[in-house]
Regions:
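Alpha-helical elements of Rossmann-like donor-binding domains used by nucleotide-donor carbohydrate transfer enzymes
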Residues: 61, 91-95, 121, 204-205, ...
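Conserved donor-nucleotide/metal-binding helix-loop-beta segment in metal-dependent transferases, i.e.
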Residues: 117-146
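Short acidic-glycine loop/turn motifs at beta-strand connectors
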Residues: 152-158
């Protein structure tokens, strides 16, 4: 299995902190955001390579970080230099798949979230299901729902529909940017793009994929900290106690 880490954004809402430094390498406690994610995922011993998808501006920072790690980490530079010219998450996924000629199952995650639970729980869930899977959590606030990916559930965790940033949310189930694609479904990303799925938000591909094949959603067993602005970063630094579940 490969783990694709989406890290090509420019984090403009965190300026000046991230004007010349990538958000995924900011420290939370004693480790960087990426360290928390990679070190946790690695404990299950099913990922044989981590692929960090970066923009050109920050690629050298990720290369320097990768050189300090014991895991096999490949940094892919998507060639963009500005927020205005960014490819978007789905196109970045496709760029990495084609550049590295990846044919494996994939864990695809955002590089700017920390969790208080181990992602290995989600990986085990997906491997047992044997199909593409996502995670979900209950969000009571309509304002937050309208800024997220929202799913409609059927029986047995099946995802019937997903919408990114819906004006009228169909449910209270939010989908965070942590996905498992089977090898077969990972090869359909280009088809999804060509069929008109959105390319900026990473969940746009899942919104298309769940209409083509079965996708299941595991309820998150803990809390996710999304670092979107300076205020949320300071809050995470004050509250986060590591992976406790």
């Amino acid at each position: 299995m490969k783990c694709l880490i989406l890290a090509a954004g420019y984090a403009t809402r965190l300026y000046p902190l991230t004007e010349n430094f990538p958000k995924p390498l900011l420290k939370v406690g004693e480790k960087t955001i990426l360290d928390w994610l990679v070190d946790d995922i690695d404990t299950l011993n099913v990922v044989d390579e981590f692929v960090v998808i970066s923009n050109h501006k920050f690629a050298h920072h990720f290369e320097g970080w990768a050189a300090t790690k014991v895991q096999k980490i490949t940094v892919v530079d998507d060639g963009t230099d500005t927020n205005e010219t960014r490819l978007g998450a789905v196109k970045d996924i496709q760029f990495a798949i084609e550049k590295l000629q990846l044919t494996d199952d994939m864990l695809v995650i955002a590089g700017d979230n920390v969790l208080d639970f181990s992602l290995t729980k989600f990986m085990q869930y997906a491997l047992e299901k044997g199909i593409s899977c996502i995670m979900r959590y209950f969000e009571p606030e309509a304002k937050k729902l309208s800024k997220s990916g929202v799913i409609t559930l059927g029986d047995g965790d099946e995802v019937l529909e997903m919408a990114e940033k819906p004006a009228v949310p169909a449910s209270n189930w939010c989908c965070p940017p942590f996905y498992y694609y089977t090898a077969e479904d990972a090869q359909l990303v280009r088809k999804g793009i060509e069929s008109g799925c959105g390319t900026d938000a990473p969940g746009s591909y899942i919104a298309w994929l769940c209409r083509q094949t079965a996708v299941h959603a595991m309820e998150m067993p803990g809390k996710r900290y999304d670092i979107g602005n300076l205020e949320s970063y300071e809050k995470v630094k004050a509250e986060y106690n590591g992976i406790t579940k």
